[in-house]
């Protein structure tokens, strides 16, 4: 791990360099030899006697030692050529940055601006712009080819075991193929069952796909607030989150310098960036929801589209007629965006402008291929409120809005709860699929109990694994600081690792091809006491190694056939290996290589023959038995 500083900037050093015993490799799709799709190869020890293991990689160029990282310049804008090659777009001057874009921050509090500006692109009328429009027209884009190669992890070996893997899981109606082709990706997008969030102005993006027939993805939330954090910290947290496996990142900043913070993040992010535009719109009217207007919100949408935001959370399902349904709740309306719109609706006694102007919102987002993440502003904030009428009324409206957005050519995913006990989780998935036409589901957890402040990454990880198994396409992480404070980089890592576990467990349960390869590789390393391979095959090699080294720090302990839990005499795996070694060294050559069960059967047969040889009596002379045993030894 290297910490690279950036000259002439107040921005922090960001974490670069590969993870332990890993290297960046690139797969080249057969149908697009000009593309280089990143993967991480875990390098196994010589004792492993098996190939290195390629795994999905979200870390971008930050883990490639051959790339020079300069946060001031941003990442390479590789995708701009793909967009221009397709045509149907124009470059234009774009709107000016206004003081209110950064919360009217004074010069003494203003963050350093990102100076490497590029003119924004937008789609032309009458041309295909979005991935959905291309997919419906039967056109396979480079983004589709790219994500297909990524999903396959560069491992055609999975074809050999895909049928067995699929048979071992319960997919609950998902249609995960043995091998992901670009055509399959195109078809899933055309059906609305998957999205590739990829604003045409986010040229630094490494495309990824969200859908229940693909690997389960996770999102990490970052962002400053009015009381804490800075641009420096948020850029650092973004790089840190993707290092550990965040597939997308949402910038939920609500304090000063919102525009500037977002610009630094976008220009340095290889993963899709999402936002909640109402947060910035609220800052522009000094935090007063009643003062919000459609014109102000529209201007904010265009501002963020031009910057390159890949998906917007828009709480258009919070309608005036639903607000009274939350009156009897234990925790009322807990969504920030939902509460803002509820207050606006009640103050003006009007339908939400997000709902009444939804067609126009679609037209704006389509020009930049910004995906919808239709927000659940009425999600339950406690298990007591789970699955109530307010929650499901909003979900039904989101289903209606999904069809409108699809008709306009926009990509859509649906946000979900929240706080839901385990026995009420599946109905959420089933109802979402039914109401929203199988659009991808994206949930916050859900948290399965409310009794564990400080441990809500665990309470939510349980629900996340379950709903991921049932078909949820992306899981929004929860950190230990949930309900308590703004997460720092340690909390971000804990949240990401927790949700990588949940997502992987869901893929295993669905029978996703090749999901188990990493588990099996680690299990073999564990049984063979290849400690270093165990660490490196895990999701967090650093923590695994540090835990082991707390009690067995010497290098010699990395090859020891025991750990500090059981010690050398009580290790079950060591005992099992001893049994196998015994089977391999029996005098009878026929027993060499015999399995444990075979050894047992052979031993039983020997004792049966001995019983008959000594007369077949139940009770025998002790001295004769002793003499017989000596003969066998």
UniProtKB/Swiss-Prot annotation:
Stretch list, region Disordered: 1-20
Record field: compositional bias (Polar residues): 1-13
Catalytic activity from the UniProt record: 5-amino-1-(5-phospho-beta-D-ribosyl)imidazole + S-adenosyl-L-methionine = 4-amino-2-methyl-5-(phosphooxymethyl)pyrimidine + CO + 5'-deoxyadenosine + formate + L-methionine + 3 H(+)
Top-tier EC class: lyase
Cofactor(s) listed: [4Fe-4S] cluster
Residues that hold Zn(2+) according to the record: 419, 483
The record's free-text note on cofactor binding: Binds 1 [4Fe-4S] cluster per subunit. The cluster is coordinated with 3 cysteines and an exchangeable S-adenosyl-L-methionine.
BP GO annotations: thiamine biosynthetic process; thiamine diphosphate biosynthetic process
Keywords, ordered alphabetically: 4Fe-4S, Iron, Iron-sulfur, Lyase, Metal-binding, S-adenosyl-L-methionine, Thiamine biosynthesis, Zinc
Known EC number: 4.1.99.17
GO terms for cellular component: cytosol
Residues annotated for [4Fe-4S] cluster binding in this entry: 563, 566, 571
Keyword Iron-sulfur: yes
Annotated positions binding substrate: 221, 250, 279, 315, 335-337, 376-379, 415, 442
Pathway assignment: Cofactor biosynthesis; thiamine diphosphate biosynthesis
UniProt GO MF annotations: 4 iron, 4 sulfur cluster binding; carbon-carbon lyase activity; zinc ion binding
Subunit structure: Homodimer.
Alphabetical list of NCBIfam families matching this protein: PRK09284.1 (NF006763), PRK13352.1 (NF009895), thiC (TIGR00190)
HAMAP family: ThiC
Function: Catalyzes the synthesis of the hydroxymethylpyrimidine phosphate (HMP-P) moiety of thiamine from aminoimidazole ribotide (AIR) in a radical S-adenosyl-L-methionine (SAM)-dependent reaction.
Family membership noted in the UniProt record: Belongs to the ThiC family.
Protein name (database record): Phosphomethylpyrimidine synthase
Protein's organism: Bradyrhizobium sp. (strain ORS 278)
Record gene name: thiC
């Amino acid at each position: 791990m290297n910490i690279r500083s950036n000259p002439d900037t107040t921005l922090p050093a960001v974490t670069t360099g590969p993870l332990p015993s890993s290297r960046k490799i690139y797969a080249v799709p057969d149908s697009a030899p000009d593309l280089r799709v990143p993967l991480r190869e875990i390098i196994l020890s010589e004792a492993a006697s098996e190939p290195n293991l390629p795994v999905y990689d979200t870390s971008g160029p930050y883990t490639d030692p051959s790339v020079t990282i300069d946060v001031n310049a941003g990442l390479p804008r590789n995708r701009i050529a793909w967009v221009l090659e397709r045509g149907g777009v124009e470059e234009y001057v774009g709107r000016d940055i206004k003081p209110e874009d950064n919360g009217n921050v004074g010069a003494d509090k203003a963050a350093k601006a990102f100076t490497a500006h590029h003119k924004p692109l937008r789609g032309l009328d009458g041309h295909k712009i979005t991935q959905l429009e291309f997919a419906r027209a039967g056109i396979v884009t480079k983004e589709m080819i790219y994500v297909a190669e990524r999903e396959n992890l560069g491992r055609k070996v999975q074809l050999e075991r895909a049928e067995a893997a699929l048979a071992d899981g319960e997919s609950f109606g998902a249609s995960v193929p043995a091998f992901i082709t670009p055509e399959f990706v195109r078809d899933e997008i055309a059906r609305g069952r998957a999205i590739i969030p990829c604003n045409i102005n986010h040229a630094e993006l490494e495309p990824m796909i969200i859908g229940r027939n693909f690997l389960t993805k996770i999102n990490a939330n970052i962002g400053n607030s009015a009381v804490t954090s800075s641009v420096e910290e948020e850029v650092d947290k973004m790089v840190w989150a993707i290092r550990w496996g965040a597939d997308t990142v949402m910038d939920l900043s609500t304090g000063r310098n919102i525009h500037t913070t977002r610009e630094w993040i976008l220009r340095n992010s290889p993963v899709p960036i999402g936002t909640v535009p109402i947060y910035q719109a609220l800052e522009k009217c000094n935090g007063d929801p009643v003062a919000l207007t459609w014109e102000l919100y529209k201007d904010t949408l265009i501002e963020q589209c031009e910057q390159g935001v890949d998906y917007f959370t828009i709480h258009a399902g919070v309608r005036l007629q639903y607000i009274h349904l939350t009156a009897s709740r234990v925790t009322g309306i807990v969504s920030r965006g939902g509460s803002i719109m509820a207050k606006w609706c009640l103050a003006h006694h009007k339908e939400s402008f997000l709902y009444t102007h939804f067609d126009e919102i679609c037209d704006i987002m389509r020009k930049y291929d910004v995906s919808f993440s239709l927000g659940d502003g009425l999600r339950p904030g406690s298990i007591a409120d789970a699955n109530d009428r307010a929650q499901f009324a909003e979900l039904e409206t989101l289903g209606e809005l999904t069809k409108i957005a699809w008709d306009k050519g926009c990509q859509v995913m649906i946000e979900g709860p929240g706080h839901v006990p385990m026995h009420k989780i599946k109905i959420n998935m089933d109802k979402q699929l039914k109401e929203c036409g199988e659009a991808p589901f994206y949930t916050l957890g859900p948290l399965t109990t409310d009794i564990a402040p400080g441990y809500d990454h665990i309470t939510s990880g349980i629900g996340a694994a379950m709903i991921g198994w049932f078909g949820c396409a992306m899981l929004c992480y929860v950190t230990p600081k949930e309900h308590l404070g703004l997460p720092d980089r340690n909390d971000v890592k804990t949240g990401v690792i927790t949700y990588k576990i949940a997502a992987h467990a869901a893929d295993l349960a669905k029978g996703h091809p090749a999901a188990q390869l990493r588990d099996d590789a680690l299990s073999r390393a564990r049984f063979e006491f290849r400690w270093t391979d165990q660490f490196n095959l895990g999701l967090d090699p650093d923590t695994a190694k540090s835990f082991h080294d707390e009690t067995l720090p010497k290098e010699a302990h990395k090859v020891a056939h025991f750990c500090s839990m059981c010690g050398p005499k009580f290790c079950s795996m060591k005992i099992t290996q001893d049994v196998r070694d015994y089977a391999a060294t029996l005098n009878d050559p026929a027993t060499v290589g015999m399995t444990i069960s075979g050894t047992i059967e052979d031993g039983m047969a020997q004792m049966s023959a001995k019983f008959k040889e000594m007369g077949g009596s139940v009770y025998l002379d002790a001295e004769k038995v002793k003499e017989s045993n000596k003969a066998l030894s």
